[in-house]
């Protein structure tokens, strides 16, 4: 209650004046071998680490793990046709890294996708620039990953696919990631549905969901 805090802040009868020990927003109050001490606010993204009995706490950088996760989910189906890389629907998300040394793990999963027996290629973009693509070799196209359209003679089948890439943006500024696609001969790409769109209950006509995820991870 207020009366007890007033007494603590005014050092009670023989304590240290808390008001003169912690002076800045974000300060942490702790006791060392002689009395109360101030630990100033740490670097953004760092955590408070105990060093055990007889040692003072410190701010420390995480040695691994996920710092934050952003995701985009597409539950509806759509089609797209282009022979050159173009943004794939609304597959887009933004993330702001907390450290320039951290990486961004990009993951995409398409519940069902087909391109009428033709190959489709996909790339990730970071603020409009392609990332995570294969090395240049002659005149060959470069992509993050590709799929081949289903080879079923019946067009009511489609398969899911997934891909993961680790990006190294080396920034603490906001980043927008997107997925782009291109299809062989500009054929139609079907997302979250098969080519044949029969309105029946057979599972091969299933509508599916697709997900795009960005996770900041400590390298």
For the regions a protein language model found, what residue spans apply to each?
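Membrane-targeting and insertion segments and their boundary/processing signals
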Residues: 18-22, 77, 151
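Short, solvent-exposed loop/turn segments enriched in Ser/Thr/Gly
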Residues: 87-89
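Extended, low-complexity regulatory regions
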Residues: 91-95
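Extracellular repetitive beta-rich solenoid segments
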Residues: 1-65, 100
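A generic structural signal for well-ordered coil/turn residues at beta-strand boundaries
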Residues: 25, 44, 68, 157-159, ...
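Terminal beta-strand-rich extracellular "head" domains
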Residues: 72-73, 79-84, 96-174, 178-219
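Extracellular receptor-binding modules and their adjoining Ser/Thr/Gly/Asp/Asn-rich linkers
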Residues: 65-74
